[in-house]
Amino acid sequence: MTKITRVGSASPPDGGWGWMIVAGCFLVTICTRAVTRCISIFFVEFQTYFAQDYSQTAWIHSIVDCMTMLCAPLGSVVSNQLSCQAGIMLGGLLASTGLILGSFATSLKHLYLSLGVLTGLGFALCYSPAIAMVGKYFSRRKAFAYGIAMSGSGIGTFILAPVVQLLIEQFSWRGALLILGGFVLNLCVCGALMRPITLKEDPSGPEKSHDRDAQREDCKQASPYSPLTKEWTETRLCCSLQQGYGFLLMSDFVVLAVSVLFMAYGCSPLFVYLVPYALSVGVSHHQAAFLMSILGVIDIVGNITFGWLTDRRCLKNYRYVCYLFAVALDGLCYLCLPMLQSFPLLVPFSCTFGYFDGAYVTLIPVVTAEIVGTTSLSSALGVVYFLHAVPYLVSPPIAGWLVDTTGSYTAAFLLCGFAMIFSSILLGFAKIAKRMKRTQVPFLVKDSDPKLHLWTNGSVAYSIAKELDQKDEESLAKARTGCNLT
């Protein structure tokens, strides 16, 4: 069977079948991120049925989130080696199998492996290839296409949260997991929509491709143990790593990475413990599930409106500050949460936290681009999202241990709130220190020799200027006449 490749124009079509790709990615985000959020609705059911404490039960949600983030590069590798369609279909089968096997679990360890590892691995194989495919079909309207595709997370949470609660009441948690397993099989349909596209190459493309093939053949014919081949390969590998991941040595990026660890630690436990906390203060099951729905839909509003606002001319130069503001406000919401012990008070909390959660998630790529530049943005974002994996894994169990130890949610929520506030303060101090360092440079230049105003490379350039001053004027005149004659 021959593989059919579709050849388009030299640039992405920005429409056509691309809108089906957007629809497919929209459904993928519903079946992955929204379903992951709704697993927290099963928390009380798992805890009651297996008679386990908070920390042990929280590992289920942590493993799903961690596997989805940790194995995202594996999803890219599978889709590149096979195809995007095959990768997403395989991920859909694995995720559905994990949910179905989870419905027959007899212990939490079975849920760790089935609902945690297997389902999380399936989500990882689907999530990153679907997002990458949108970028292949869109160029000018890429941001708008991504806005529609990524909104599936919030919309899916808004719809699925009350539906999952209803399924649990009607069919128990086992029946609800079984039905979710069938629902997640729609990922295979989404994978079928991801039709590959091959863009026309430039006229010089075939020659370049031919040259690359010739070089590849020469490398194959060369002995792998040749010292020259080995030295060239090692040099090329070091240069490519330095160009692709040189930002890891930047102090600003190191500060961002540390702040992301604290931010990810703070934001994750709420999606696990909001429903159990609401139930513990006397809120009904339907109202607790509705709080998750509110959180999801307001998250979409934060994504769209905050991104639009920071694109305005008045705020465009203050995106970094807006990011810090959003993260800090989510931390303040955490600090206020232990005092909110009724449904009318928890609704404004869900709205506020959901809005600013969507706000700073939108600005993460923007802040990263300001630090590393657009050239290394793709690699830097991969590292930033990879750093979410460990906090997503450990923060819910730590919060659960605090609940078991103290008998209340106060300590867990306060720790999460202070973690997010510290993340914001850390980036803020780094920004202030960098600005103060810049303001000191003009004062140093004013106090130095006036010739430094003409040279930008410091002492080396000044020594060159000094040598030119010591040159004999006659030799310089002869040099000028010689240039004129030639």
Swiss-Prot record:
Q: In which tissues is it expressed?
A: Detected in kidney, choroid plexus, testis, lung, stomach, large and small intestine, spleen, fat and parotid gland. In eye, expressed in cornea, ciliary epithelium, lens epithelium and lens fiber.
Catalytic function, reaction form: creatine(in) = creatine(out); guanidinoacetate(in) = guanidinoacetate(out)
Q: What happens when the gene is disrupted?
A: Homozygous knockout rats are born to expected Mendelian ratios and no obvious ocular phenotype is observed.
Question: What is its membrane topology?
Answer: Multi-pass membrane protein
Could you tell me which residues belong to the region Disordered? 201-221
- Write out the transmembrane intervals: 10-30, 58-78, 86-106, 115-135, 148-168, 177-197, 253-273, 289-309, 320-340, 353-373, 383-403, 410-430
**Record keywords, A-Z:** Cell membrane, Membrane, Transmembrane, Transmembrane helix
* Ranges annotated as biased composition (Basic and acidic residues): 201-220
Q: Which CDD domains match?
A: MFS_MCT12
Question: What spans does the record annotate as topological domain Cytoplasmic, numbered to this chain?
Answer: 1-9, 431-486
**Presence of the UniProt keyword Hydrolase in the record:** no
An example of a Gene Ontology cellular component annotation for this protein is:
basolateral plasma membrane
MF terms per GO, please?
creatine transmembrane transporter activity; transmembrane transporter activity; uniporter activity
Its biological purpose is as follows: Functions as a transporter for creatine and as well for its precursor guanidinoacetate. Transport of creatine and GAA is independent of resting membrane potential and extracellular Na(+), Cl(-), or pH. Contributes to the process of creatine biosynthesis and distribution.
Q: Which PANTHER family match?
A: MONOCARBOXYLATE TRANSPORTER, MONOCARBOXYLATE TRANSPORTER 12
Family the UniProt entry places it in: Belongs to the major facilitator superfamily. Monocarboxylate porter (TC 2.A.1.13) family.
Kindly provide the name given to this protein in its UniProt entry: Monocarboxylate transporter 12
